[in-house]
From Swiss-Prot:
Broadest EC class assigned to this enzyme: transferase
Gene coding for it: nadA
Keyword S-adenosyl-L-methionine found: no
Species the sequence originates in: Ralstonia nicotianae (strain ATCC BAA-1114 / GMI1000)
UniProt-recorded name of the protein: Quinolinate synthase
Function, as annotated: Catalyzes the condensation of iminoaspartate with dihydroxyacetone phosphate to form quinolinate.
EC number(s) stated in the UniProt entry for this protein: 2.5.1.72
GO biological process per UniProt: 'de novo' NAD biosynthetic process from L-aspartate
Amino acid sequence: METHIKTVEFERPNMLAEAQSGASCVAHAWAKVPPALSREERDALKARIKRLLKERNAVLVAHYYVDADLQDLAEETGGCVSDSLEMARFGRDHSAKTLVVAGVRFMGETAKILSPEKTVLMPDLDATCSLDLGCPPDTFAAFCDAHPDRTVVVYANTSAAVKARADWMVTSSIGLKIVQHLHEQGQKILWAPDRHLGSYIQQQTGADMLLWQGSCLVHDEFKGVELDLLRAEHPHAKVLVHPESPPSVVAQADVVGSTSQLIAAAQSLPADAFIVATDNGILHKMRMAAPGKRFIEAPTAGNSATCKSCAHCPWMAMNALTNLAEVLETGRNEIHVDPQIGQQAVRCITRMLDFAAREKTTVRPQGDLAANTQLFQGVGPA
């Protein structure tokens, strides 16, 4: 296949610099993670949150990467535990007047864009995303202006302002199909922000893609050399990889897919053990979906003392029972999206939703498990 990958170097803020103040600094994000609670404290908070959800006519929507207690609480109260797009869909379609989003800020923004009439709260407004931070709206707009001949396709993990500049928003499971569709129409793509996901999609489709050079703090730390050593220790384990991971990791995958797709693989594939290269928050749902199977965390670069994420997003970890209860009691931490930006951003989201409704397709598994493609029907993001 002829390749048409282009990358560009440009000056932009180092949003992950250790010296930076605020929760965009990784060290500061970890410092904001609430302390562990006793069983008694957790049970008391859960009971309090359940009462507050009813009193506020609110529903809890949580991502697969947040604390297991929050995932369980969402399901126990009629909420939703899913990927970011399904979180927004669920909130849009639910009758609750208040959506409480346990995740990171772009998820709350997307929920607000799709449900502008509803109140959207988050446990901590500082819970952000390295992909979002690494794609500043003004710099991105200038980048787009410099390449007016390209169709702008952005990943869900971006701010509302970046989405407002895009022609399409995609998720990790529908991105392949949308880019293939655009490629067949002869369109050249400007892709942002994740370079690994963009490279993976380009290699699968052959599209002409200009890649923004962003990456996920968690997935970028998975390394092919360490994974190869772990596979030697567990030769019968299947490898599940999120496509935000580096190419050396994706190349070793039995299944490449979004969070929902990897959970489906863990549940449905005939294997007793899986090596999982994505945020370890997903392991709670995988163990629930496949209780008789073993899940092994893929190693990250500099495991233990020197890793930045150690396979868990520090901003996802900022969501906890304590600040969830506080936000329900006070009504603070409300997500606001400028109406003009929201009206512009909703177009690229709706375009993807309409396309997905027509296509009902997903990222295809790689390698030995290609025959299991039918297991991964549906649309869901990171």
